[in-house]
From Swiss-Prot:
This is Small ribosomal subunit protein uS3. GO terms for biological process: translation. The gene is rpsC. The keyword Ribonucleoprotein applies. Belongs to the universal ribosomal protein uS3 family. Keywords: Ribonucleoprotein, Ribosomal protein, RNA-binding, rRNA-binding. Residues 212-270 are annotated as: Disordered. GO terms for cellular component: cytosolic small ribosomal subunit. Residues 38-106 form the KH type-2 domain. Part of the 30S ribosomal subunit. Forms a tight complex with proteins S10 and S14. Coiled coil: none annotated. Residues 216-225, 245-263 have a biased composition (Low complexity).
Protein backbone atom coordinates (compact mmCIF):
# COMPACT_ATOMS: atom_id res chain seq x y z
CA UNK A 1 0.00 0.00 0.00
CA UNK A 2 2.91 2.32 0.62
CA UNK A 3 3.81 2.10 -3.07
CA UNK A 4 0.48 3.59 -4.17
CA UNK A 5 -0.65 6.10 -1.56
CA UNK A 6 0.51 9.72 -1.47
CA UNK A 7 3.46 9.87 0.98
CA UNK A 8 2.31 13.21 2.44
CA UNK A 9 -1.19 12.02 3.30
CA UNK A 10 0.12 8.66 4.51
CA UNK A 11 2.33 10.37 7.12
CA UNK A 12 0.00 13.13 8.32
CA UNK A 13 0.55 13.65 12.04
CA UNK A 14 3.74 11.56 12.03
CA UNK A 15 6.31 13.43 9.93
CA UNK A 16 4.14 15.82 7.87
CA UNK A 17 1.56 18.46 8.68
CA UNK A 18 -1.51 19.87 6.91
CA UNK A 19 -0.90 22.53 4.25
CA UNK A 20 -4.22 24.20 5.13
CA UNK A 21 -4.67 24.98 8.83
CA UNK A 22 -8.15 26.18 9.75
CA UNK A 23 -11.46 24.92 11.11
CA UNK A 24 -14.93 25.58 9.73
CA UNK A 25 -18.33 24.03 10.21
CA UNK A 26 -20.89 25.27 7.70
CA UNK A 27 -18.34 27.08 5.51
CA UNK A 28 -16.06 24.07 5.10
CA UNK A 29 -16.79 23.46 1.39
CA UNK A 30 -16.45 27.18 0.61
CA UNK A 31 -13.04 27.33 2.30
CA UNK A 32 -11.82 24.22 0.46
CA UNK A 33 -12.89 25.70 -2.87
CA UNK A 34 -11.22 28.98 -1.94
CA UNK A 35 -7.95 27.22 -1.04
CA UNK A 36 -7.90 25.48 -4.42
CA UNK A 37 -8.48 28.81 -6.17
CA UNK A 38 -5.67 30.47 -4.16
CA UNK A 39 -3.18 27.76 -5.09
CA UNK A 40 -4.19 27.87 -8.76
CA UNK A 41 -3.81 31.65 -8.81
CA UNK A 42 -0.31 31.47 -7.30
CA UNK A 43 0.98 28.65 -9.52
CA UNK A 44 -0.56 29.70 -12.84
CA UNK A 45 1.90 31.87 -14.74
CA UNK A 46 4.56 31.56 -12.01
CA UNK A 47 6.39 28.46 -13.29
CA UNK A 48 9.71 30.32 -13.41
CA UNK A 49 9.42 31.24 -9.72
CA UNK A 50 9.86 27.62 -8.59
CA UNK A 51 7.03 27.48 -6.06
CA UNK A 52 7.41 24.43 -3.83
CA UNK A 53 4.25 24.63 -1.71
CA UNK A 54 1.60 27.08 -0.50
CA UNK A 55 0.44 26.97 3.13
CA UNK A 56 -2.83 28.65 4.13
CA UNK A 57 -3.88 29.57 7.67
CA UNK A 58 -7.18 31.28 8.46
CA UNK A 59 -8.60 33.31 11.32
CA UNK A 60 -11.93 35.10 11.54
CA UNK A 61 -10.78 38.30 9.82
CA UNK A 62 -7.46 37.38 8.19
CA UNK A 63 -5.96 34.85 5.79
CA UNK A 64 -2.25 34.09 6.01
CA UNK A 65 -0.59 32.67 2.90
CA UNK A 66 2.98 31.31 3.07
CA UNK A 67 4.61 30.82 -0.34
CA UNK A 68 7.74 28.62 -0.34
CA UNK A 69 9.75 29.40 -3.46
CA UNK A 70 13.25 28.82 -4.81
CA UNK A 71 13.38 32.27 -6.46
CA UNK A 72 11.74 34.79 -4.12
CA UNK A 73 12.90 37.72 -6.26
CA UNK A 74 10.52 36.74 -9.06
CA UNK A 75 7.55 36.50 -6.68
CA UNK A 76 8.37 39.80 -4.95
CA UNK A 77 9.10 41.70 -8.16
CA UNK A 78 10.79 45.08 -8.52
CA UNK A 79 10.26 47.07 -5.32
CA UNK A 80 7.57 44.61 -4.25
CA UNK A 81 5.25 45.38 -7.16
CA UNK A 82 4.52 41.73 -7.96
CA UNK A 83 3.87 40.87 -4.30
CA UNK A 84 1.44 43.81 -4.00
CA UNK A 85 -0.40 42.65 -7.12
CA UNK A 86 -0.71 39.09 -5.78
CA UNK A 87 -1.91 40.35 -2.39
CA UNK A 88 -4.56 42.55 -4.04
CA UNK A 89 -5.85 39.63 -6.14
CA UNK A 90 -6.00 37.38 -3.06
CA UNK A 91 -7.93 40.00 -1.07
CA UNK A 92 -10.36 40.37 -3.96
CA UNK A 93 -10.83 36.59 -4.05
CA UNK A 94 -11.27 36.05 -0.30
CA UNK A 95 -12.87 39.38 0.70
CA UNK A 96 -10.58 39.38 3.74
CA UNK A 97 -7.29 40.91 4.77
CA UNK A 98 -4.42 38.79 3.40
CA UNK A 99 -0.98 38.44 4.97
CA UNK A 100 1.41 37.25 2.26
CA UNK A 101 4.72 35.71 3.40
CA UNK A 102 7.30 34.76 0.77
CA UNK A 103 9.80 32.21 2.11
CA UNK A 104 12.92 30.98 0.34
CA UNK A 105 13.62 27.25 -0.04
CA UNK A 106 17.14 26.79 1.31
CA UNK A 107 18.06 23.58 -0.56
CA UNK A 108 16.00 23.25 -3.77
CA UNK A 109 18.02 20.22 -4.97
CA UNK A 110 16.31 17.99 -2.37
CA UNK A 111 12.83 19.50 -2.63
CA UNK A 112 10.75 16.90 -4.48
CA UNK A 113 8.30 19.35 -6.03
CA UNK A 114 11.08 21.57 -7.40
CA UNK A 115 13.01 18.54 -8.70
CA UNK A 116 9.90 17.28 -10.52
CA UNK A 117 9.31 20.74 -11.96
CA UNK A 118 12.93 20.94 -13.16
CA UNK A 119 12.73 17.55 -14.90
CA UNK A 120 9.43 18.54 -16.54
CA UNK A 121 10.93 21.79 -17.85
CA UNK A 122 13.79 19.84 -19.44
CA UNK A 123 11.33 17.42 -21.06
CA UNK A 124 9.39 20.39 -22.47
CA UNK A 125 12.68 21.66 -23.92
CA UNK A 126 13.17 18.30 -25.73
CA UNK A 127 15.95 17.03 -23.48
CA UNK A 128 16.24 13.22 -23.40
CA UNK A 129 14.18 11.95 -20.47
CA UNK A 130 16.87 9.54 -19.21
CA UNK A 131 19.45 12.31 -19.17
CA UNK A 132 17.11 14.65 -17.26
CA UNK A 133 16.27 11.96 -14.69
CA UNK A 134 19.90 11.00 -14.06
CA UNK A 135 20.95 14.64 -13.72
CA UNK A 136 18.26 15.24 -11.08
CA UNK A 137 19.31 12.11 -9.18
CA UNK A 138 22.99 13.10 -9.14
CA UNK A 139 22.21 16.63 -7.92
CA UNK A 140 19.97 15.35 -5.11
CA UNK A 141 22.48 12.76 -3.88
CA UNK A 142 25.28 15.34 -3.88
CA UNK A 143 23.09 17.70 -1.81
CA UNK A 144 22.66 15.18 1.02
CA UNK A 145 19.64 13.05 0.11
CA UNK A 146 19.66 9.48 1.47
CA UNK A 147 17.75 8.19 -1.55
CA UNK A 148 15.71 9.36 -4.54
CA UNK A 149 13.36 7.85 -7.09
CA UNK A 150 12.27 9.64 -10.30
CA UNK A 151 9.51 8.28 -12.52
CA UNK A 152 8.32 9.52 -15.92
CA UNK A 153 5.08 8.30 -17.51
CA UNK A 154 3.73 9.06 -20.97
CA UNK A 155 4.86 8.96 -24.59
CA UNK A 156 8.54 8.90 -23.69
CA UNK A 157 10.78 9.83 -26.60
CA UNK A 158 7.76 10.31 -28.86
CA UNK A 159 6.80 6.61 -28.81
CA UNK A 160 3.32 5.69 -30.00
CA UNK A 161 2.56 3.62 -26.90
CA UNK A 162 2.89 5.28 -23.51
CA UNK A 163 4.94 3.63 -20.76
CA UNK A 164 6.54 4.36 -17.39
CA UNK A 165 10.23 4.34 -16.52
CA UNK A 166 11.93 5.15 -13.25
CA UNK A 167 15.44 5.40 -11.86
CA UNK A 168 16.34 5.03 -8.22
CA UNK A 169 19.45 5.54 -6.14
CA UNK A 170 19.86 4.95 -2.42
CA UNK A 171 17.02 3.90 -0.10
CA UNK A 172 13.39 5.03 -0.45
CA UNK A 173 11.42 3.16 2.28
CA UNK A 174 7.82 4.02 1.37
CA UNK A 175 6.29 1.70 4.01
CA UNK A 176 8.22 3.21 6.95
CA UNK A 177 6.06 5.86 8.60
CA UNK A 178 8.98 7.38 10.51
CA UNK A 179 10.90 7.94 7.26
CA UNK A 180 11.02 11.58 6.14
CA UNK A 181 9.99 11.24 2.48
CA UNK A 182 9.22 14.24 0.29
CA UNK A 183 6.98 13.76 -2.75
CA UNK A 184 6.39 15.93 -5.78
CA UNK A 185 4.45 15.72 -9.05
CA UNK A 186 4.49 17.88 -12.17
CA UNK A 187 3.30 17.52 -15.77
CA UNK A 188 5.45 18.35 -18.78
CA UNK A 189 3.61 19.60 -21.87
CA UNK A 190 5.33 18.32 -25.00
CA UNK A 191 4.38 18.12 -28.67
CA UNK A 192 3.58 14.41 -28.19
CA UNK A 193 1.30 15.01 -25.21
CA UNK A 194 1.69 15.33 -21.47
CA UNK A 195 4.36 13.46 -19.50
CA UNK A 196 3.88 13.03 -15.77
CA UNK A 197 6.93 13.32 -13.51
CA UNK A 198 6.88 11.92 -9.97
CA UNK A 199 9.74 12.31 -7.47
CA UNK A 200 10.27 10.67 -4.08
CA UNK A 201 13.20 11.89 -1.93
CA UNK A 202 14.25 10.15 1.30
CA UNK A 203 15.93 12.55 3.74
CA UNK A 204 16.51 10.17 6.67
CA UNK A 205 14.68 9.15 9.81
CA UNK A 206 12.41 11.87 11.17
CA UNK A 207 12.74 12.83 14.87
CA UNK A 208 10.14 11.66 17.36
CA UNK A 209 6.70 13.20 17.20
CA UNK A 210 5.59 15.68 19.85
CA UNK A 211 3.35 13.09 21.54
CA UNK A 212 6.21 10.59 21.74
CA UNK A 213 8.58 13.18 23.20
CA UNK A 214 6.03 14.19 25.85
CA UNK A 215 5.38 10.54 26.75
CA UNK A 216 9.11 9.84 27.08
CA UNK A 217 9.61 12.90 29.32
CA UNK A 218 6.63 11.91 31.52
CA UNK A 219 7.99 8.38 31.92
CA UNK A 220 11.40 9.76 32.84
CA UNK A 221 9.89 12.07 35.47
CA UNK A 222 7.79 9.24 36.93
CA UNK A 223 10.82 6.98 37.27
CA UNK A 224 12.65 9.64 39.27
CA UNK A 225 16.39 9.91 39.84
CA UNK A 226 17.99 6.52 40.45
CA UNK A 227 20.89 6.37 42.93
CA UNK A 228 23.64 3.94 42.18
CA UNK A 229 25.37 2.46 45.23
CA UNK A 230 29.09 1.95 45.07
CA UNK A 231 30.18 -1.65 45.63
CA UNK A 232 32.07 -2.38 48.86
CA UNK A 233 35.84 -2.29 48.56
CA UNK A 234 37.98 -4.87 50.34
CA UNK A 235 40.85 -3.42 52.28
CA UNK A 236 44.20 -5.03 52.69
CA UNK A 237 44.49 -7.36 55.66
CA UNK A 238 40.87 -8.56 55.48
CA UNK A 239 39.38 -5.36 56.95
CA UNK A 240 36.19 -3.77 55.69
CA UNK A 241 32.55 -4.70 55.64
CA UNK A 242 32.82 -7.14 52.75
CA UNK A 243 35.61 -9.19 54.42
CA UNK A 244 33.76 -9.46 57.77
CA UNK A 245 30.59 -10.72 56.10
CA UNK A 246 32.55 -13.36 54.21
CA UNK A 247 34.26 -14.56 57.42
CA UNK A 248 30.92 -14.81 59.24
CA UNK A 249 29.43 -16.83 56.37
CA UNK A 250 32.39 -19.23 56.36
CA UNK A 251 32.15 -19.67 60.17
CA UNK A 252 28.41 -20.44 59.97
CA UNK A 253 29.03 -22.99 57.21
CA UNK A 254 31.72 -24.74 59.30
CA UNK A 255 29.45 -24.89 62.36
CA UNK A 256 26.63 -26.39 60.29
CA UNK A 257 29.00 -29.02 58.88
CA UNK A 258 30.26 -30.01 62.37
CA UNK A 259 26.69 -30.28 63.68
CA UNK A 260 25.74 -32.55 60.77
CA UNK A 261 28.77 -34.80 61.43
CA UNK A 262 27.93 -35.04 65.15
CA UNK A 263 24.33 -35.98 64.41
CA UNK A 264 25.44 -38.65 61.94
CA UNK A 265 27.94 -40.22 64.40
CA UNK A 266 25.25 -40.28 67.12
CA UNK A 267 22.86 -42.14 64.85
CA UNK A 268 25.52 -44.73 63.94
CA UNK A 269 26.39 -45.35 67.66
CA UNK A 270 22.76 -45.98 68.54
Amino acid sequence: MGQKVNPHGFRLGVTTDFKSRWFADKLYKDYVKEDVAIRQMLTRGMERAGISKVEIERTRERVRVDVHTARPGIVIGRRGAEADRIRANLEKLTNKQVQLNILEVKNPEIDAQLVAQGVAEQLSSRVAFRRAMRKAIQSAMKSGAKGIRVQCSGRLGGAEMSRSEFYREGRVPLHTLRADIDYGFFEARTTFGRIGVKVWIYKGEAPMTRAEREAAQAAQRAAGPQRRERPGRRRRGGGGGGGQQQQQAEKATAQATEAAKAAKSGNEGS
